[in-house]
Structure formats: C-alpha cells, structure tokens
Design a protein with these regions (language model features):
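Helicase motor core with emphasis on the C-terminal RecA-like subdomain
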Residues: 1-11, 15, 19, 23-45, ...
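Gly/serine-rich nucleotide phosphate-binding loop at the start of the catalytic core
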Residues: 60-61
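C-terminal accessory region of SF2 helicases/translocases
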Residues: 277, 295, 299, 303-312, ...
Length: 631
C-alpha cells in the first residue's frame, strides 16, 4: 500500500492529512474519477499533488487562475519538485520549451489554462507525455449552471479522449447540487464519486449590518475586533479611498487591485502577511491562494453578486480555527446596484454584436481572416474610439468568449522572465564582462534554479536590492546579455489579450445560444436574488442559509450569527422580536421618545420591550441621550 503520509511528511512537513484529504487521495490512487468539494482553506492542492508524486508520470493541472498557477509552480519548485506552466501571454518559444521539458525532463506537474487545451501544439506534444493524472481545479467552471462558466473547460472532455484510462480529479470550493451533477457528466466520470467536506465554519460568525454610513460602520467594526482583516470592495478607486480613511483613523491599511503592477502587488501582499499592515483593502483580485490563517475579520463594503463569491471570500477569515467574523455591510442602494449589474453583465445581444463588429474595425480584421491571431487590447482606448462603456464592453467580450468567437483575457501581469541560451560550461568560459555584469550573473545563478532548461520569473527590484545596482542598471544589463545571446530576457508586461479563435464572421451571423446567454442570465439573476435575500433576512440563521444554498442540510442554527444572537439575547421568537423592533424604530424615526412614552405606545410585556431596546442600543441601531431614545 502506498505510504501517502510519508510523501506528505517529506515534501510538506505534515504528519497527518486534514478532513477528507486522505479519502480523496486514496480514491485517486485506486484510479477512480473523483470530485472533491472542499471549502476555501480546505487544502485542495494536497489532494492531487500527493497522489501525483506517488506514481510515475506527469500530473496535468487545468486551472483558469494564472496567479495561483504561478504561485503553485513556484512553491513546488521550492520543494524540489519539477513543475511548469502554460498560459496566455507566453511566447511560442516559452511554450515549446515548457512542453519539451514535460516530455523529456522528468517533470511532475504541468499547469495549463483551459484555453491552451485546444491549441494544435499542445495536443501534438500531449500525445508524447506520460500523463498519470488529470486535475481540474475550479471545476464549477465547466458547468453552465456554475457562477463562473468558461466554455474552454468543455474541451477537457476531448483531452480525456486523448488520454484514455487516465483518472481525473475535479476540485471546487463552491458547487450547488445541480453543478455537482453537471461537473461529473461533462467530465465523463465513469461512475459518480463525490467526496464532500462540510461547508460549515463553526468558528466563523456571519453578520449583516444595515447602514447608510458604511465608513463609520467599517471603522466601528475594526475598532471592536482585534487582529488582521480584509475589506473587499468592487471598485478599484474605493480600495485606495478606504485604505486612506483607515490610516487617517490610526488603523494601518494598504490596498490591492488588478490594476497595480506585479511588484507593488507582491510587496503589499507580503507586508500584510507579515503584519506590517493590519488591514488589506482589495477587490476580488486579492485572496486566491493566500495562506494567512489568523485573519480575524473579512468585511464586504460592497455586496458580491453571488453566494459562491461571498462564501469563498468570507471564508478567508479564521482558517486557524479561532473565532472570526464575516461582515456584510448593506444599504438601501445596494439592492438597486445589484439589479443594475444584470444589464451590465448581460448587455443586449445587439450591443454585443456591435462590439464584435467594432473589435474587427479596431484590428482592421478582414472577413474570413483572423483565426489564431493574438492582439494586445487596451479597453480604455477602444471604448474612447468607439463610444462604449468599459463595464459592458468587458461583459460583451466575455460572452463572445463563451460563444467561441474570441478568447478574451482580463488584465494579467506577466512578470519578467529569463532563461540562459548557452550552457553552464559556456557561461563560465565567457570573459570581458563588466564587474556589474559578473555580479548580476552570480546573483542570478544563486537565486534561481533551472535557468538553463526553463524560463524563471525574476524580480528586478529584488535583484537591485541584492546587487546594489539600480533597477535601471539591472534592466540595461539584462537587455545587453539578451543582445549577446547569453540569455533571453522578457521584460514585465501588463496587458489584456484578445485572440481570434475563429475567422471573422459577418456581424449578423453572430449566434448567441440560449445556453450561452438566456440560461446564464437567468442563473445570474437567481444568484443576485439569493444575495439580496441573504442580506435582507432578519429571522433566519445566516450560516444555515448559506449551507442550504450549497445543498447541505443542517438542522441546527449556528448560534453566533447576528440573527441567532439577536434571538438568543431577547428570549423572543424571531417574529415577535422583529415586530417589536420595527415598531420601535418606526416611532423613533418620527421623534425621540422617553422610555415611558415608548411603553405607552407599544403594548407588550415590559421585559420583552426592554430586551429589544437593550439589543438595539448595544448594536448602536438606536441611541440614548438625556433620557430620550433616538434613531
């Protein structure tokens, strides 16, 4: 019997597996197609990395998350495990080298974005690889019912035909019962085989705060809850504004979004992980693959557009098992904003076709041409030229991607990378280099492994710090070495891409199927409504609401969300408490009242009334001043 724990100890230093990890690993070891449902922080990567290391051959990992892909490749290499990745934005030379290494270089892991599966070069090279396991991360993306459906995932079934007999492990942190069934069907599971880790987080208290002054409420929460925190907002500009607001109020904070360059994002992430900043204010670009177990509070200043997204982001709190809070700030306008997102996310079909037509004009693409062509895409410039709105343009391009006409990648930061183009022996024989160049070469060789066989990501900032040379000197020296054909240097580049997956079509022939458009729009509306229901509910346990959404039955209330605490503290049934609370708040909105005046107006037992008053005062929903209660 394979000793999986020995592998776990050797490479990760752990003595035992957690939760259902070992059950999933043994299922894969037996050659069975396996679906693992594990919440954020459940240790998904262990479930495919350990069995892959236990057998001969290569593990093919399909994931849409480029940042996570790079992070896992780096972590595996640091453990002495050969791993590489292929994704949009790489040069053809880089892709060929990575694929050749997987055929001849005894590599254990090849990470690939789903869009690469359909390329001719990938499918040719794949036939020569000894693949022992296919891993499908974020597997909900294969389901049209999932909140992040990606048509490229449907190509995985074709890959299974090229690799008959190779088992597949599908992983996701968020899947409704409908999606669970769809994943297994679309991945052609030989038989149903699902392992579920409970999505219940017993140490995490879910809270909704209804407020029209989110900044003050945010500050109030962070002053009452100690420890590290994350504040999520949908707007890049607001990440900076909220961060500045917190710093002005003596709470150390920094901000993070996809528009920042790689170096800035990396340095801020590391500073927050080390505790140099207490709070990270971010868009949803932050958090995937982040390992910080002691986050005490995650606050959503804006409402996510699906329970899946909310559950995943909120779940970054309390991974150490200690008490933590997930707080959603909700105001009257949020409901209107959520409804508006439907038209932003699903523009009219005529508008989508118009954007396709304008894209063709933008790139001067002739009818019948374009298949396989890749272009950098500046969405702001495009929208200025053709009078479109960026949000709807982004959505239209994603729908055209799902329909198979284009491949559109959001902004992605491709860090600088290098690879030596001569052998190590030839490098040592080179003379007549400057002292600075010699110094930089020595640091490169000490800092990065595998530079003679594969491209490695480098940081000019880190090289500058270690060498004492300026960042500009590092850049110029690497360019000089590249011109001398000693190494190949690809400077960092930050840009989205558009790739024509088909020849240019006549605009009126662009077909957006019911599955691609109407069904997905309906599903999106249902998720929006589920979030509104969650935020507005005042009498149902929030943990049970989330678990029920994901198909997990739970007969007991959590006892720690704001709804449960309200009911417990009052000793009233939820309906009774809510009726008194609403009546009291309605009276106080009209005029401040003394306690005696309230007793005269609300005819309920005094002990019940006082419990409601005490709770509303403690939660700062109402306040007491000079003998009067005020809203």
């Amino acid at each position: 019997m394979t000793d999986y724990r020995k592998i776990l100890k050797q490479y990760w230093g752990y003595d035992n597996f957690r939760g259902i990890q070992e059950d999933i690993i043994r299922s894969i070891g037996e050659g069975r197609d396996t679906l693992g449902l594990m919440p954020t922080g459940g240790g998904k990567s262990i479930t495919f990395q350990v069995p892959a290391l236990a057998q001969e051959g290569l593990c093919l990992v399909i994931t849409p998350l480029i940042a996570l892909m790079k992070d896992q490749v780096r972590n595996l290499r640091e453990r002495g495990i050969k791993a590489t990745a292929i994704y949009s934005g790489m040069t053809r030379e880089e892709i060929v080298i990575a694929l050749e290494n997987c055929i001849f270089g005894n590599y254990k892991f090849l990470y690939v974005s789903p869009e690469r599966l359909d390329t001719e070069i990938f499918q040719i090279k794949l036939r020569s690889m000894h693949v022992s396991l296919i891993t499908v991360d974020e597997s909900h993306c294969i389901s049209q019912w999932g909140y992040d459906f990606r048509p490229a995932y449907l190509k995985i079934a074709d890959i299974r035909q090229l690799l008959p007999g190779v088992p597949v492990i599908a992983l996701t942190a968020t899947a409704t019962p409908e999606v669970v069934s769809d994943i297994q069907q679309r991945l052609q599971f030989r038989q149903e085989n699902v392992f579920r880790m409970s999505f219940e987080r017993k140490n995490l208290a879910y809270v909704v705060r209804h407020t029209e002054d989110k900044e003050s409420e945010l500050l109030h929460i962070l002053q009452r809850v100690d420890g590290s925190g994350i504040v999520y907002t949908r707007n890049r500009k607001k990440t900076k504004e909220i961060s500045q607001f917190l710093n002005r109020n003596h709470i150390t904070a920094t901000f993070y979004h996809a528009g920042l360059n790689d170096e800035t994002k990396d340095s801020r992430q590391k500073a927050w992980l080390k505790g140099e900043f207490r709070v990270m204010v971010a868009t949803n670009a932050f958090g995937m693959g982040i390992d910080k177990p002691d986050v005490r509070v995650v606050i959503h200043a804006d409402v996510p557009d699906s329970p899946e997204a909310y559950f995943q982001e909120a779940g970054r709190a309390g991974r150490d098992g200690m008490k933590a809070y997930a707080v959603l700030l909700f105001c009257a306008r949020d409901k209107i904003t959520l409804k508006q997102r439907v038209s932003d996310t699903f523009p009219e079909k005529s508008h989508i076709r118009k954007i396709y037509e304008d894209i063709n004009f933008y790139y001067q693409m002739a009818m019948g041409d374009g298949r396989g062509c890749t272009f950098a895409f500046n969405i702001d410039e495009f929208c200025r030229n053709f009078k479109h709105f960026p949000v709807q343009t982004d959505s239209a391009l994603k729908i055209l991607t799902r329909a198979g006409y284009l491949e559109y990648t959001d902004e992605q930061d491709n860090a600088s990378r290098i690879m030596f183009t001569i052998t190590k022996e030839e490098l040592y024989r080179i003379r007549e280099q400057s002292e600075d160049t010699e110094k930089l070469l020595r640091i490169l060789l000490r800092s990065y492994t595998g530079l003679f066989t594969d491209y490695a990501y480098i940081s000019e900032d880190n090289l500058s710090t270690r060498s004492g040379l300026s960042k500009q000197q590092i850049y110029e020296t690497l360019l000089s070495l590249s011109r001398q054909h000693i190494l190949h240097y690809i400077p960092a580049k930050k840009t989205p891409y558009i790739i024509y997956t088909r020849e240019r079509q006549e605009t009126e022939r662009i077909y957006l199927s019911k599955e691609v458009y109407e069904d997905r729009k309906e599903s999106y509306v249902q998720r929006i409504n589920a979030m509104i229901e969650y935020a507005e509910s005042e009498n149902r346990c929030r943990s049970r609401m989330l678990l029920r959404y994901f198909g997990e039955k739970n007969e007991h209330n959590c006892g720690q969300c704001d709804v449960c605490l309200q009911q417990h503290q009052s000793g009233l049934k939820s309906g009774e408490f809510e009726a008194i609370s609403q009546q009291l708040q309605a009276l106080l909105k009209e005029n401040p009242l003394s306690l005696q005046e309230i007793k005269d107006k609300i005819q309920v037992p005094e002990n019940q009334l006082m419990k409601v008053v005490s709770y509303l005062v403690s939660e700062e929903i109402i306040r007491q001043e000079n003998g009067y209660l005020k809203f």
